[in-house]
Amino acid sequence: MRKQQKIHVKIGDNVKIITGFDKNKIGKVSKIDRNTGKIIVKGINFKFKHIKPNAENEVGEIKQFEAPIHHSNVKLN
């Protein structure tokens, strides 16, 4: 079992991204994973997942979702 990390932000806090592609953007914390030390910020760090067509789904699609970022890459705003 991993030790839970102490995280300096809470759900609902406004944070500013300090590193990475979304640097200097501001968003609200929507989810926290204390085991991995990662957070999900609403409207930040979008990733795409390409889904192939299969027997049930005749057409493929591209789904967009918010990926988690490490809590050390944000600061309170």
Curated annotation (Swiss-Prot):
Q: Name one Pfam family in it.
A: ribosomal_L24
Which SUPFAM superfamilies does UniProt cross-reference here? Translation proteins SH3-like domain
Relate the assembly described in the record: Part of the 50S ribosomal subunit.
Spell out the HAMAP family in the cross-references: Ribosomal_uL24_B
Q: CDD domains recorded for this chain?
A: KOW_RPL26 (cd06089)
- Tell me one GO molecular function of this protein: rRNA binding
Q: Which cysteines are joined by disulfide bonds?
A: none
Query: Is Membrane among this UniProt entry's keywords?
Result: no
What protein does this entry describe? Large ribosomal subunit protein uL24c
Q: Which organism is it from?
A: Trieres chinensis (Marine centric diatom)
For this UniProt record, the keywords arranged alphabetically read as follows: Chloroplast, Plastid, Ribonucleoprotein, Ribosomal protein, RNA-binding, rRNA-binding
Sorted alphabetically, the Gene Ontology cellular component annotations on this record are: chloroplast; ribonucleoprotein complex; ribosome
**Chief location category:** plastid
